């Protein structure tokens, strides 16, 4: 973990990341960017496990590692094409919130909606609480 602070620089030197596939977590987290403890302007960062558990007491820690290392929201914004997968009935409520709620640290994945080339792929179960209007998405202005 001693060189994580240069990961973003090394990725940029190599030409960046063309496509990244990530998943939406049951509570709105992504890539270990958890509610109430994700710095929304972070590049790749390390976070002490106890910080995550204090901010999210319902989490179960099944890891002996004292730190999590992850790409923060600012790092993911540099990916050329970001793809989010949402699957399962158990994610239907959080998926609806992800689409409708304002961007916040309570639901960190909402920041991903700002990505300029963002694709969401959801199965029927995950989309089961969405209306036809929700599924159409925001209107796009045509030139």
What kind of feature is each model-predicted range?
Residues 1-143:
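Conserved phosphate- and dinucleotide-binding cores of soluble alpha/beta proteins
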